[in-house]
Amino acid sequence: MDSKHIGNVNYLMENSRTGILAIGAHPDDIELGCGATLANLAQKGCHITAIILTAGNAGCASGISRHDESRQALNILGCQDLFTFHFEDTRTEHYLDAIITSIDDVIKTQQDAGIRFLRAYTMHDKDRHQDHRAAHQASMVACRTIPQILCYETPSCRLSFVPQAFEEFNEAGLENKISALKFHQSQKHRDYMQPTYIRSLAQFRGLQAGMALC
């Protein structure tokens, strides 16, 4: 995770309506970037809300619903609410105002339902994928009232990502993440979706932080 200060997460667990918001440009971004962390927070009682900005059509064959893949994957991770949008894949930078409004609307809807967001996870501003950068830009505006915003790591920002905060999870959390990613059958051919890749990265970041898995 990329943040100046992560703080103590215990304050997040005061009640079951404590909200965590996760934002991704495409189906699988959230699961790849913070899947184990979300599973851990869900188990501790946080209400997980996810937003996916595009259908990810440019990344798979026609006729496949990547939103459905993510819905199943995020369910495994304990996500209670998923909001999906259909902004144009690979061209989201042209719709920033509309994306900001869409995220704003989700936040307000959830707040009206009694959910109190204390943290948001979003994409990194130095990501090589233009949709990921747009997701970051929109999130920073739309989530301005949320006390803490953390940026997660994805394969397309690996070279530029320098973690400033680490979140530890256990073996069960890692297995949850690996199990969730298996629902993304349209992406199973990609190297970064393989369990050995996911585990190796978690171990590497753990070594950096003096933990078992991050």
Which residues are covered by each model-predicted region?
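Active-site rim/loop-helix segments in enzyme catalytic domains that contact anionic ligands
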Residues: 1-116, 141-145, 201
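Structural signal for conserved beta-strand scaffold positions within catalytic alpha/beta enzyme cores
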Residues: 52, 84-86, 122, 151, ...
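Short histidine/acidic/glycine/proline-rich micro-motifs that form metal-
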Residues: 55-60, 88-92, 124-129, 184-189
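Active-site adenylate/phosphate-handling loop in enzymes that bind or generate adenylated species
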Residues: 102-156
